[in-house]
Structures are given as structure tokens and as C-alpha cells.
């Protein structure tokens, strides 16, 4: 494949460099352990072979490849993780990672690889399929002119290339924010959904969300222009395709940049609903979860209970305050819980599930005061679109403080799945598409696109490549993708092939094989590769923790300089920044 690549530019503090420092640190710790406990030497042999950091470029890329694949697939719905879809995602990552690592940092300070992985994670959380996620990753490479759509078609597949073509069509829609009145914005949203692949629209929405999360480097005027575009076009569009959480986050970020003072006021008030250092919604969530788990009657009907908590979005709250003239404490549904029950009966799970929902409502009434006129029984009387759930509102005020009402939704796992699946058709109206026939047609387009992707990625059984079982975990999946001949071992030839696909010399494969092959038999077993992946997972978690601690330290240190009369805090602050910037 002929790929035009820019001159390699060193990327400071890239993830793979940090990962390999962690590997070396693990090795030192294990050596110290061995001095105190010689008997641990045999037990640590396999891990030590992995802990020796493979400093070659190929080894670093394999670490990045395995880590990225696992991070994305563990968030995906198992329905999408067939053999074909896993291979597709793996091929896209192999093609993209070497190129993305060689590109310069973006204007927001992130590496292109970091941005590509952020997009893929959002899409995985939205339960998009491997083809959409692969196209999203590759779009960053194509956008940098490092590879063409035609090359993607030849090396990845026609379906992915088509999606890339669609996403760039969507990105190039011309419009100006100064003419985006309500009618024009509604027409533009309808144009999006009528003339473009719905999956490309979702990819564009995710790209816009990622952009909105990193606006601080832009001038104030540009931040406001983008935020207005999001409120007029992208947030309602996200609602129209059923991505409600994405829509709410887009609204809140836009609100923060357009109306910073109002946002701070509402945000401070919402955060004031805390019990000590813990958000109030978490307190209620834990209280309800304990009560449900302790109830013996409910325990006979359900295997498990899940509870989700949420605060009303800042933008949604602002609209209610301005529209109705209410005070913040008079806004209902600021707090919300959703109880999802998993019935333990297979034969009569519908009947048992309904009884469990009503039993849950009785337990809730024993904890808080119910507001009767706010109760809506959509289980006994489902909505026209088939929606079934039990809605309640309760008063959680105590003797010390009056609090807003809390809304609680109660449903079974099946009811929740049906509600989410039906979100798209219902939200097409809220997204500004008020024609029922048009909404029904657009829903059919969305379902057809999903069916087409499922058919395209359907597994074809063969003797050479076995389908993944539903119980296959993330580590086994990567091992099977590298074990191309299916003999249960990764040979030096198979490892070398991956290295070459990543653009690294074959010698790196030999070095990495020596480091990972603990029994020196010339190949990697699933256990040896599993040890390697555990190290990768361990290091990625510690890198995230390190960044978290750095932020906390920065916050603490920046709050204290005015109290420092000796200059020691400023000195320590500078030394800390210098150390962190060199590691």
C-alpha cells in the first residue's frame, strides 16, 4: 500500500512511552520483592518477561494496538462483536495507529491518536457497530491526507470507505450561523436526516461533541459561534436520532460558553445538593439500593437490581426557569433515579417483572413521601408507542432543608431495552420533525442501515476461522486475531507480520518474542499473551490515575500561593511541573 506520511515528529509524553516506563517500574518492584522472598522468583518469571519493556518501536505499537482494541471493544455491545466485526476493527487500528502517531499535535494540544480513540469510545458507548467505529478512527487519518478513501476501500472494505465518503459529505454542508433562525435550523436538520447515511450523521455528532469538549484553546468569539451552531443544529439533531445523553451534553457545554454567568449560578445551585462531600443523588441512590436488596419479597422475584441517577441538565433547567418564571427550588425533577429490575423467572418473566415493579414502588413509598398526582402507571396503561414503565415523584425534603421533588422510573430490563430501542422514533418529534409519516420513514431508514451493517458483518463459518463464543473475553479476542492460522499459538512469523503492518522492522518481533515467551519455546501461548495484556491494562489505569493526581495537585497548589510567605510553595510547584513534564 502506498501511503503518504509526513515526516515523523516526536510526540512528547505519548501514551506508549508512559506505558513502557510503567513496565520498567514493575520490573524494579518485582526485583525488590525477590530480594526479600526468594521463593517468589519462580512465580514472577512469566510476569518479569513481560515487565522488561520492549523498547523497540514495534513493541510499543503492539502495546498501543492491544490496549486500544481492548478499551474500545469492552464498551461495545456483545451483539456487534462477531469474528468479522472484530477483525474489521483490528485492521482499522493496525492501519491507523502508526500514521496517527507520526502526525503533529492538534491545535487543542492533543495527539491525533488520542482524538481518534476518544471518538471511538463515544461511539462504542452509543452502541454503534464496528464498521462505524472503524470509519471514525480512519477519518482522522484521511482528514490529515495521510491516506485516501480509495486506499481504505482496498485494504479495509467498501462499506467502511462508503461511510468515510458520507462523513466528509456531512462535514462539508455549508451553512452560516447568522441565518440560522428556527425555521432554517429545522430545515437543515431535516436535510441531514433525509440525504445522508444516518450513521455518518451520528459520527458527525460525536465529532462535534469531542470538539466541544476541547474549546478552551479557541478565541472567545469562536467558542460562542460554535456553541450557537450546536444549540441550533447539533443538539436537536442528536435528540432526533435518539442519542439523548449526547444531546444533553452538547446543550450543557454550549450553555456554559454562551451564558457563563448563568451557567455558574445554576451549576453552583445543583452542586449545593450535596450531603457533606457526596452528591445528594448518590446518597438517595445508595439508600434505595440497600432497601431493595434487603427486601425478602423482592428478592424472590428478581436476580439483580440496577439504579441509575441523574441531575437535570443545566440548559434544560434554565429553559424552565425562563419560560415559567419559577425559582430554582421550584423546578421539579431536578433529581432523578431509574430502577431497572432483572426478573429471575424465565417462564413467566413478564408477569414476575410487573409484580417486581409494583413491589419496588411500595418500598419507595416506605422511604419517601409519594406525590400521588405525579404517579403514572405506563405498565398497566402503556403509551401508544408501546412504552412501559412506572413513574413516581417523591418528596425527599427533611426537617433541615426543603428539596425539590425527585422523579423515579421503575422498569424491568426488557422494558428498558424496548424504551431505548423506541427512543429514536419518539425523539424524532422532539428533534423538530413533526410529520408522523416523515418520522416513520426516517426511523425505517435508521433500522435498514443497522440491518445492512449486521448482514455485511455476519460471520461466515469456516474450518480455518472459528466464530467467537459469547463468553470469549477481551483478551482471548485479541489473541485469536493475532493467531491467524488458529493453532492456539502466536508464532514469530505471525508476530512479525503484525509488526510489519504497523510499519516496524521485523527485528522488533524477535525482541518482543524473547521478552514475552517465558518458556522459550519460540511461540506465545494464550497464557503468556494474557500476562502481557494484564500488564497493558494495569499501566493504562495507572496513567489515568497519574493524570488525575496531577490535576488535584495543580488545583491544591494554585489555591495556596497567596498564603505562602516563604516562597516554598512556588518553588515546589515549579519543581513538580518540571518533573511531570519530563516523565
Swiss-Prot record:
**Catalytic activities:** GTP + ATP = guanosine 3'-diphosphate 5'-triphosphate + AMP
Q: In which tissues is it expressed?
A: Expressed in shoots, cotyledons, rosette and cauline leaves, stems, sepals, pistils and siliques.
Locate the site labelled Required for ppGpp synthetase activity: 309
- Transit peptide feature range: 1-58
Keywords in UniProt for this one? ATP-binding, Calcium, Chloroplast, GTP-binding, Kinase, Metal-binding, Nucleotide-binding, Plastid, Repeat, Stress response, Transferase, Transit peptide
EC code: 2.7.6.5
Q: Which InterPro entries does the UniProt entry name for this protein?
A: EF-hand-dom_pair, EF_Hand_1_Ca_BS, EF_hand_dom, HD_domain, NT_sf, RelA_SpoT
A Pfam family reported for this protein in Swiss-Prot or TrEMBL? EF-hand_7
Highest taxon, organism lineage: Eukaryota
Q: How is its activity regulated?
A: Activated by calcium.
CDD domains found in the cross-reference section = NT_Rel-Spo_like (cd05399)
Q: Where in the cell is it found?
A: Plastid, Chloroplast
> What GO molecular functions are on record for this protein?
ATP binding; calcium ion binding; GTP binding; GTP diphosphokinase activity; kinase activity
Q: What is any one of the record's Gene Ontology cellular component terms?
A: chloroplast
Using the record's annotation, list all stretches that form the HD domain.
112-212
The entry's Ca(2+) 1-binding residues are 483, 485, 487, 489, 494
Q: What upregulates or represses it?
A: Circadian-regulation with a peak at midnight.
The alphabetized list of GO BP terms reads:
guanosine tetraphosphate metabolic process
Q: Where is the EF-hand domain?
A: 470-505, 507-539
Renumbered to this chain, the signal peptide range is none
Chain's role? Possesses calcium-dependent ppGpp (guanosine 3'-diphosphate 5'-diphosphate) synthetase activity in vitro and is able to functionally complement E.coli relA mutants. Plays an important role in the timing adjustment of pistil and pollen maturation required for successful pollination. May be involved in a rapid plant ppGpp-mediated response to pathogens and other stresses.
Q: What's the record's remark on domains? A: The calcium-binding sites of the 2 EF-hand domains are required for enzyme activity.
- What PANTHER family does the database record attribute to this sequence? GTP DIPHOSPHOKINASE CRSH, CHLOROPLASTIC-RELATED (PTHR21262:SF12), GUANOSINE-3',5'-BIS DIPHOSPHATE 3'-PYROPHOSPHOHYDROLASE (PTHR21262)
More details: Plants silencing CRSH have abnormally small siliques with few seeds, due to altered timing of pistil and pollen maturation and unsuccessful pollination.
Family, similarity comment: Belongs to the RelA/SpoT family.
Protein name from the UniProt record:
Probable GTP diphosphokinase CRSH, chloroplastic
To which species is this protein native? Arabidopsis thaliana
The lineage, from the top, is: Eukaryota, Viridiplantae, Streptophyta, Embryophyta, Tracheophyta
Encoded by which gene?
Answer: CRSH
Amino acid at each position: 500500500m502506498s501511503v503518504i506520511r509526513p515526516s515523523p515528529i516526536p510526540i512528547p509524553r505519548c501514551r506508549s512511552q508512559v506505558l513502557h516506563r510503567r513496565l520498567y517500574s514493575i520490573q524494579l518492584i518485582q526485583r525488590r520483592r525477590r530480594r526479600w522472598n526468594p521463593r517468589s522468583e519462580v512465580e514472577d518469571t512469566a510476569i518479569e518477561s513481560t515487565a522488561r519493556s520492549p523498547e523497540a518501536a514495534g513493541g510499543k505499537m503492539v502495546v498501543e494496538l492491544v490496549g486500544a482494541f481492548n478499551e474500545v471493544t469492552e464498551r461495545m455491545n456483545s451483539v456487534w462483536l462477531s469474528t468479522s466485526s472484530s477483525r474489521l476493527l483490528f485492521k482499522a487500528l493496525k492501519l491507523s495507529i502508526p500514521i496517527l502517531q507520526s502526525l503533529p499535535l492538534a491545535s487543542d494540544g492533543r495527539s491525533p491518536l488520542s482524538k481518534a480513540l476518544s471518538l471511538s469510545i463515544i461511539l462504542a458507548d452509543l452502541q454503534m457497530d464496528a464498521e462505524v467505529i472503524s470509519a471514525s478512527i480512519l477519518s482522522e487519518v484521511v482528514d490529515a491526507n495521510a491516506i485516501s478513501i480509495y486506499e481504505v476501500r482496498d485494504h479495509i472494505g467498501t462499506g467502511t470507505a462508503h461511510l468515510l465518503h458520507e462523513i466528509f459529505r456531512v462535514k462539508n454542508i455549508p451553512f452560516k450561523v447568522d441565518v440560522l433562525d428556527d425555521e432554517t435550523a429545522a430545515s437543515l436538520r431535516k436535510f441531514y436526516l433525509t440525504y445522508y447515511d444516518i450513521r455518518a450523521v451520528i459520527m458527525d455528532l460525536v465529532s462535534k461533541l469531542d470538539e466541544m469538549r476541547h474549546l478552551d484553546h479557541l478565541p472567545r468569539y469562536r467558542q460562542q459561534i460554535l456553541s450557537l451552531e450546536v444549540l441550533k443544529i447539533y443538539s436537536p439533531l442528536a435528540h432526533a436520532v435518539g442519542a439523548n445523553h449526547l444531546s444533553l451534553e452538547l446543550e450543557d457545554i454550549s450553555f456554559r460558553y454562551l451564558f457563563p454567568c448563568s451557567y455558574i449560578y445554576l451549576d453552583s445551585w445543583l452542586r449545593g445538593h450535596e450531603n457533606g462531600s457526596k452528591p445528594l443523588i448518590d446518597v438517595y441512590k445508595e439508600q434505595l439500593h440497600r432497601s431493595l436488596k434487603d427486601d425478602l419479597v423482592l428478592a424472590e422475584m428478581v436476580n439483580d437490581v440496577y439504579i441509575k441517577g441523574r441531575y437535570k441538565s443545566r440548559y434544560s433547567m434554565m429553559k424552565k426557569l425562563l419560560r415559567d418564571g419559577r425559582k430554582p427550588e421550584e423546578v421539579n425533577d431536578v433529581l432523578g433515579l431509574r430502577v431497572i429490575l432483572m426478573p429471575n423467572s424465565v417462564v413467566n418473566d413478564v408477569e414476575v417483572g410487573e409484580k417486581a415493579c409494583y413491589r419496588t414502588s411500595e418500598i419507595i413509598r416506605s422511604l419517601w413521601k409519594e406525590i400521588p398526582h405525579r404517579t403514572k402507571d405506563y405498565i398497566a396503561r402503556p403509551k401508544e408507542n408501546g412504552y412501559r414503565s412506572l413513574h413516581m415523584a417523591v418528596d425527599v425534603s427533611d426537617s433541615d432543608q426543603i428539596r425539590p421533588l425527585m422523579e423515579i422510573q421503575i422498569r424491568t430490563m426488557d422494558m428498558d431495552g424496548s424504551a431505548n430501542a423506541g427512543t429514536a422514533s419518539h425523539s424524532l418529534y422532539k428533534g423538530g420533525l413533526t410529520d408522523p409519516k416523515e418520522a416513520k420513514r426516517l426511523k425505517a431508514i435508521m433500522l435498514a442501515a443497522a440491518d445492512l451493517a449486521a448482514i455485511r458483518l455476519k460471520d461466515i463459518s469456516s474450518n480455518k476461522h472459528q466464530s467467537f463464543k459469547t463468553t470469549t473475553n477481551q483478551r482471548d479476542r485479541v489473541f485469536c486475531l493475532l493467531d491467524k492460522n488458529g493453532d492456539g499459538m502466536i508464532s514469530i512469523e505471525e508476530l512479525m507480520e503484525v509488526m510489519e503492518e504497523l510499519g516496524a522492522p521485523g527485528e522488533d518481533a524477535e525482541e518482543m518474542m524473547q521478552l514475552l515467551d517465558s518458556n522459550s519455546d519460540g511461540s506465545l501461548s494464550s497464557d503468556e499473551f494474557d500476562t502481557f495484556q494484564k500488564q497493558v491494562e494495569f499501566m493504562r489505569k495507572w496513567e489515568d490515575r497519574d493524570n488525575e493526581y496531577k490535576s488535584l495537585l495543580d488545583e491544591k497548589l494554585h489555591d495556596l500561593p497567596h498564603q505562602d510567605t516563604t516562597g516554598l510553595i512556588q518553588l515546589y510547584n515549579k519543581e513538580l511541573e518540571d518533573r511531570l513534564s519530563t516523565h
